[in-house]
Amino acid sequence: MKLLHLTTALYLAATTGIASAQDPNLARNLAASCANCHGTNGNAVVGSGMAPLAGVDKGRLLQAIKDFKSGAKPATIMHQIAKGYSDEQMDLIASFFAVQK
């Protein structure tokens, strides 16, 4: 499972930079990989123990992702996944979840 997340993150990081200016669905597509743990559109399954992402303040979520990436915030898998995203991609993901309900 960890390898799948890491592979997905690295693939997206390698291929989406070129497409970012052309794909209006890029934020949604990047955020889709988060559904594996955090639920569809960031609506975590009740009782799963996973934090919901839908409606979380963009700045707060962006800082959390950056903290996972830098290692400042401990995690089991997020520190690996976050390393696969550029700053621009993390901003898109945080923006996407901030407007979800």
Where are these regions (language model features)?
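Sec-dependent signal peptide recognition
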Residues: 2-9
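N-terminal signal peptide c-region/cleavage motif recognized by signal peptidases
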Residues: 14-16
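Local sequence-structure signature of Cys/Sec-based thiol-disulfide redox active-site neighborhoods
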Residues: 25-31
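Gly/Gly-Pro-rich "capping" loops immediately C-terminal to redox-active cysteine motifs
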Residues: 27, 42-69, 79, 83
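The canonical Cys-X-X-Cys-His
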Residues: 32-40, 93
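Detector for the c-type heme attachment site
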Residues: 38-44, 98-99
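C-terminal capping alpha-helices of c-type cytochrome domains
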Residues: 70-73, 82-101
